[in-house]
Swiss-Prot record:
Family per record: Belongs to the class-II aminoacyl-tRNA synthetase family. ProS type 1 subfamily.
Species assigned in the record: Enterobacter sp. (strain 638)
Keywords: Aminoacyl-tRNA synthetase, ATP-binding, Cytoplasm, Ligase, Nucleotide-binding, Protein biosynthesis
Subcellular location: Cytoplasm
EC assignment: 6.1.1.15
Alphabetical GO biological process terms: prolyl-tRNA aminoacylation
PROSITE patterns the UniProt entry points to: AA_TRNA_LIGASE_II
Protein name: Proline--tRNA ligase
Function, in words: Catalyzes the attachment of proline to tRNA(Pro) in a two-step reaction: proline is first activated by ATP to form Pro-AMP and then transferred to the acceptor end of tRNA(Pro). As ProRS can inadvertently accommodate and process non-cognate amino acids such as alanine and cysteine, to avoid such errors it has two additional distinct editing activities against alanine. One activity is designated as 'pretransfer' editing and involves the tRNA(Pro)-independent hydrolysis of activated Ala-AMP.
Family matches, as NCBIfam families: PRK09194.1, proS_fam_II
Amino acid sequence: MRTSQYLLSTLKETPADAEVISHQLMLRAGMIRKLASGLYTWLPTGLRVLKKVENIVREEMNNAGAIEVSMPVVQPADLWVESGRWEQYGPELLRFVDRGERSFVLGPTHEEVITDLIRNELNSYKQLPLNFFQIQTKFRDEVRPRFGVMRSREFLMKDSYSFHTSQESLQETYDKMYEAYSKIFSRMGLDFRAVQADTGSIGGSASHEFQVLAQSGEDDVIFSDTSDYAANIEFAEALAPSAPRAAASEEMKLVDTPNAKTIAELVEQFNLPIEKTVKTLLVKAVEGSAYPLVALLVRGDHELNEVKAEKLAQVASPLTFATEAEIRAVVNAGPGSLGPVNMPIPVVIDRTVAAMSDFSAGANIDGQHYFGINWDRDVATPEVADIRNVVAGDPSPDGQGTLMIKRGIEVGHIFQLGTKYSEALNASVQGEDGRNQILTMGCYGIGVTRVVAAAIEQNHDERGIVWPDNLAPFQVAILPMNMHKSYRVQELAEKLYSELRAQGIEVLMDDRKERPGVMFADMELIGIPHTVVIGDRNLDSDDIEYKYRRSGEKQMIKTGDILDYLVKAIKG
């Protein structure tokens, strides 16, 4: 490709509305342009990268035995009503009515469509297992699209769905998908972790997220410093302290704390160690409970894990925090003065709280706290559960090492769905015993457009993008200095350009009448891994300058050796 016949579209300045580095560089490198909020046009450079991601995903899905299909973006509302998600999904589901007054949605995902297809196409266990995938546009009406293509409304996704007659068969395919995903992200040159995850509203028995490690990530990735253990923040187990609870050394006393309505204020005003404080959060109880609310207690410096809390038998789902009015109706005190002593509703405490002694908590009286509280002396030990987020330095749940926390960008997610959709849509086949058998499902997604942004977040410097070799829009950039004035520069550039293309190497030759500084800046911004600079001065000694983008290393290579050097560097 020649720049004179190509839409380069690079920008010198960073657009003001671009928050994260991937969004900034995708705009500056001429990869995307914003059409409307959360909607982007992919320009030639961006599309070349996107297609490389697609191709790697498609190759590994084919290698894993998945079968490619293509399903409509527009889906009939009837299917969503039948599955129960018409009411459940929320405003992210874009709904519309056609001229015949029939209701439809723009697909954010395709569980309903694929399950409907399978229930009409398969009839026997002998046809299973099967795993179908597509790489296709999705639409989710995000309330606040942000970070460019990282969280857009329209995006490209690889979604696949497997069907089985047994849990053992599902597990086998799940393991294949786990391995395929690991190969996909490894081939892309990404630093990632496969982490155990909560199955959430999708349900099912197992789930893993694939997280690309990056400071701009929205997720906390938890992993051991010595083992393979990895999980997301919602799933990671916080073990109980190994040391026994210390004996009481203080008497409980009631203290006036009129200006301490938060843990931070209590700690500051009374010079307390935050590790000796407890915060109390009230949430709505499950329907039918004898009490309207449940009290959840975590240490002052810890955070409640809402996913874990929602799984408690006493707690309503979805987890809903009580309003101040609801709290006062039950406890007769405000949110800043709550604690376990004389709490008139069920109490669940975190494992760490159960190991505390001589701690401080609200007295359930406005403007007052108890100091020196001890379990079983001042208040009976209530139910104990793991309800907090882990923190760096906690022991790893697998017993090996301690936990570290880094930020991550979720680029893939695999689920064992079980029978949630097949039961709702009555997808069954005749089993080996002749009876109808509801199918067991797995689903596996990769955010294809998000992968592009995640790769940039992990691979950039002050000059621009530093693509992993397998994702770069071009493999080689040829920069002929003043080729329009020098016949020998032009002749050698054209020769090398043709030879590289004949080798199947993707090459961009900058044949613009531009200053060298502009040419260098654009190629570094775009992130092409290998650059060759052809100029009259170096040709006097039969040399060509070669530069590797990632290291910045430059070297002189003889004109007769440059082709072999590049072929070896690229193809190995």
